[in-house]
Amino acid sequence: MQVPESSLAHLSEWQRDAFVLSSGTCLPQQKAEVYRAHLAQIQYAWANSEISEASAVHLFKKYAEKYSAIIDSDKLEIGLNNYADSILTLAKCQRNESDKWQSSLTTNNVLKLKSVQDMAVAGRRTQLSKSSADASVRVGNGINTSGYSAGLGNNVLRNSGYTVPHAALSDCQMPGGSANFLQKPKISAFTIANTTSVANTSSNTLINNSISMTSSLMQSNEDKDPASFSGHMFLPTTSVHSGKRKAYSALGNESSDIKPNPLVQRQLTNKEATCESGFKTAKEQLWVDQQKKYSNQPQRNPSPLYGGAKKSLGAARSRGLHGKFVPPVPRQEDVQDSNRKVYGQGNSEMNAPSDERLKNIEPKMIELIMSEIMDHGPPLNWDDIAGLEFAKTTIKEIVVWPMLRPDIFTGLRGPPKGILLFGPPGTGKTLIGKCIACQSGATFFSISASSLTSKWVGEGEKMVRALFTVARCHQPAVIFIDEIDSLLSQRGEGEHESSRRIKTEFLVQLDGATTSSDDRILVVGATNRPQEIDEAARRRLVKRLYIPLPEASARKQIVVSLMAKEHCSLAEQEVEAIVLQADGFSGADMTQLCREAALGPIRSIQLMDISTITPEQVRPIAYIDFQSAFLVVRPSVSQKDLELYENWNKTFGCGR
């Protein structure tokens, strides 16, 4: 009897898994994968009626128990973290800023919980019930402005209306010098006559010893529970002061003002700072950031968070139809004006720009332009750009070498002010601009047309002027403008005045009466619509290089470079066939073709196996995957567009 091929395949997989389980070097992850494969094979065999239902139930239960034993185990030797791999795979490319996280779970927040407060109240009641005597001491004198008790003694005034239990006082252990400062009272209350004598005899002692008592009390309670400490030793400020006034008015004595103790206030401020909650609102965090940012500047006040001090919102001031609108969030100009008023003349040197050429440029524009500097990312080499040998050779001669050796390339050998890269989309114009900056060691500015435009009249030309001023301070510099046709399009009658002024300022800064021939600033523009560029801009962009579609050798280089990073099985003849069939594809189209072919092995996997298969079990990329990809990916450039580029290159281009 001949066994079907499918049964032989399942038998082979079952035997291979059995050998994996029997080996002594099998990891928990491998065991779990084997048991998952067994469960899937059991379901598949039962669905095809290859085994009976009873056998399927028995085998499924057997291997499900073994699988759950591995998954549910907490031991690292035999257990498996079933979620770590997928989570780490998703999170490995994400930025991790856990050092800036702030936990809101603090001791202060826990003590505010109702259950914790109930436990504290129950504990105090139990402690009071166990006390041998229920003595009450009236507190009235020696209270500073922070609400902290600074004047407790053997006998104090009783008219404040605030009672401190003896159990609370017994918890406070004083140093040797103040051991007799707080003692257990022998009677529960005092008469008015005794109070008069107490006020005359112990007031000086209380005032003189307030500093030593409060400092000792803070040290003795440093490590205790903040809740019990605050509940026993902090008194209500309003009731205490009112009781003090009543006591002195009843006795007929003149009240003497006791100034707050600066030592106690400093200690209380530090105590409150340590107990501060970890959570901060956006307003508080902004205030803290401003304090940190300007902490090194003397006599500086925090800038207003929402508007200036003289501005108001809501019904605080009436505004008619012609009233001035006050924004809820201050503009950058308002914040800078208020900061300049607060800093005074002492910080004029600190606020001065580092370069004299930037002193007339607004700081916000300088910051915006500096944020456009591309000084990050992997460096690019000329070999990373497939094909385009004529364009790369020309750029090396007229751009890279003059920037590397400005002493040799002087006079007529000097580099041009601008280069225009035109051609179909997806041919590598942006890569050439980045490679120019990397190979020449220049500062690379990647500017879009939207970065130089503004809705405010006059801001656009200021931004263009600031761009070239900052570039002159960072020479050699390369200003790359992608889709330059949107910025320097042809000027017409119906054009807006602000757009015309931006173009005029750009052309003047690029090559005008105020520019210097010694400036090593190169403007590289890329476009796929060269016919829409203004004539004056076309004259200033001296070198106009046509970036055509990749040739056969360039397409082969793209395929080989992309497939070298993947698991594929392509022969040399198959690669040649793919290159010939991809005639008319741009560089971006070739990349999309390889992406689509790389998904072919994934699409061949059945849906029920996608959750159990390992990356090693995915078959390599084959020639049939590229054939399927050609049915989906089409060239993005038509023959009519290619003829347009060819004609414009013959008229205005610099050869090929």
Curated annotation (Swiss-Prot):
Annotated GO biological process: ATP metabolic process; microtubule cytoskeleton organization
Skewed-composition ranges (Basic and acidic residues): 331-340
Disordered, as annotated region: 293-354
Gene3D superfamilies: 1.10.8.60, P-loop containing nucleotide triphosphate hydrolases
Matching SUPFAM superfamilies: P-loop containing nucleoside triphosphate hydrolases
Biased composition range(s): Polar residues: 293-302
Domain of life the protein comes from: Eukaryota
Key words, A-Z: ATP-binding, Cytoplasm, Hydrolase, Magnesium, Metal-binding, Nucleotide-binding, Nucleus
InterPro entries hit by this protein: AAA+_ATPase (IPR003593), AAA_lid_3 (IPR041569), ATPase_AAA_core (IPR003959), ATPase_AAA_CS (IPR003960), FIGNL1_ATPase (IPR047858), MT-severing_AAA_ATPase (IPR050304), P-loop_NTPase (IPR027417), Spast_Vps4_C (IPR015415)
Principal location listed in the UniProt entry: nucleus
Residues given in the record as ATP binding sites: A386, G426, T427, G428, K429, T430, L431
Reaction(s) catalysed by this chain's protein: ATP + H2O = ADP + phosphate + H(+)
Cofactor: Mg(2+)
Statement: the UniProt record of this protein carries the keyword 4Fe-4S: no
Pfam families: AAA, AAA_lid_3, Vps4_C
UniProt-listed Enzyme Commission number(s): 3.6.4.-
Compartments, record wording: Nucleus; Cytoplasm; Cytoplasm, Perinuclear region
Sample GO molecular function, one term: hydrolase activity
Entry similarity comment: Belongs to the AAA ATPase family.
Domain notes: The N-terminus is necessary for its recruitment to DNA damage sites.
Role this protein plays: May be involved in DNA double-strand break (DBS) repair via homologous recombination (HR). May regulate osteoblast proliferation and differentiation.
Name of the protein: Fidgetin-like protein 1
Gene name per UniProt: fignl1
